[in-house]
Amino acid sequence: MKRITCMIFLLCTVFVLSAQESAKTLVVDLKSHETKKVLVVAHRGDWRNAPENSLQAFQNCMAMGVDMIEIDLKMTKDNQLVIMHDNTIDRTTDGKGKVSDYTLAELRKFRLKNGLGRVTFHSIPTLEEVLELTKGKILINIDKGYDYFQEVYKLLVKTQTI
């Protein structure tokens, strides 16, 4: 039993270290003018197998070997940054209205819809949750986020993802 536990620990350690190294390698490739590597970018995550912009959609991307995810930001009524492409939550959740009309706690009550419009158990993630999930594993392209530059920067520092 000790041997199995040690093996699992070693495998997990190797996986975590290689994941952290992979993000660093991707940054080098992204900045290089000489690389011939094509980066695979997933717009709103793996929206075919999970609700778009859900933590599961981003987790699926990492499992598939995607290099980068593209996300969009919206600000809640209580100044929390969440991941949402549209100006309203109408299409992607079982709620209605603008993100800015709700607090984060209120938004958490809504469920994300899958690509076929069916309600799932997934909720709207915060930027901080996405940064923690993807830290050192995959690159993130933050689109529609310039208006929130200062808030994003603070979260990057807080999560040590800068």
Residue ranges and their predicted role:
Residues 1-23:
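Bacterial Sec-dependent N-terminal signal peptides
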Residues 19-162:
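Phosphate-group recognition and catalysis centered on beta-loop-alpha active-site segments
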